[in-house]
Swiss-Prot record:
Gene3D superfamilies the UniProt entry points to: Ribonuclease H-like superfamily/Ribonuclease H (3.30.420.10)
Primary localisation category: cytoplasm
Residue stretches spanning the membrane: none
Subcellular location: Cytoplasm
Family classification: Belongs to the RNase HII family.
GO terms of molecular function: manganese ion binding; RNA binding; RNA-DNA hybrid ribonuclease activity
Record GO biological process: DNA replication, removal of RNA primer; mismatch repair
Top-rank taxon, per record: Bacteria
Protein name as it appears in the record: Ribonuclease HII
Cofactor remark from the record: Manganese or magnesium. Binds 1 divalent metal ion per monomer in the absence of substrate. May bind a second metal ion after substrate binding.
Annotated source species: Haemophilus influenzae (strain 86-028NP)
Length: 197
């Protein structure tokens, strides 16, 4: 059981999606839930079906006291590395909340340096903390939608299928077609594809 920090009224949960993909932004979400308006079935977004995720995402947006998305683009990831870009995107999500939280719970083992709000990192937080579960769902739904949009632009890369992750199919497409402007140049398979073309 996770014990919430005492003495804080508004607690935000923050999570990121998209550290592993070779393409596109890393997307984060920050969520302050309403204790008087609970949401059933919150869990780590990776453990939910797409249908369930989409339904929960709508419910979170409706019932949460505040929610916001943040992002760091592929060129930022290449510039400052994926970990720093994830932390930057988390800060952006928190700063975009229409209500400022008193405390922030961050999934993982690192806290963004420039939050300026008391914070705690929670390993496996997307399983343990409802606010982080909610954030993981919003971030995952947002990023998957972006991959579906990219798929419409470049159907030959099959982004809707692999969501940009380095699957066998994605690596084959990279080798065959080369990298797009949206690909993360600092990631080894993309670097390799750029050298070939």
């Amino acid at each position: 059981m996770f014990e919430y920090p005492q003495g804080y009224e508004l607690i935000a949960g923050v999570d990121e999606v998209g550290r592993g993909p070779l393409v596109g932004a890393v997307v984060t979400a920050a969520v302050i839930l309403d204790p008087n308006n609970p949401i059933e079935g919150l869990a780590d977004s990776k453990k939910l079906s797409e249908k369930k995720r989409l339904a929960l995402a709508e419910e979170i947006k409706e019932k949460a006291l505040a929610w916001a998305l943040g992002r760091a683009e592929a060129n930022e990831i290449d510039e400052i590395n994926i970990l720093q870009a994830s932390l930057l995107a988390m800060t952006r999500a928190v700063k975009s909340l229409k209500i400022q939280p008193h405390f922030v719970l961050v999934d993982g083992n690192k806290i963004p340096k420039d939050l300026a709000i008391p914070a705690q990192a929670v390993v496996k937080g997307d399983n343990l903390v409802a606010e982080i579960s909610a954030a993981s769902i919003l971030a995952k739904v947002a990023r998957d939608q972006e991959m579906e949009e990219l798929d419409k632009q470049y159907p030959e890369y099959a982004f809707a299928q692999h969501k940009g992750y380095p699957t066998k199919l994605h690596l084959e497409k990279l080798a065959e077609l080369g990298a797009l402007p949206q690909h993360r140049r600092s990631f080894a398979p993309v670097k390799k594809a750029l050298e070939q073309f």
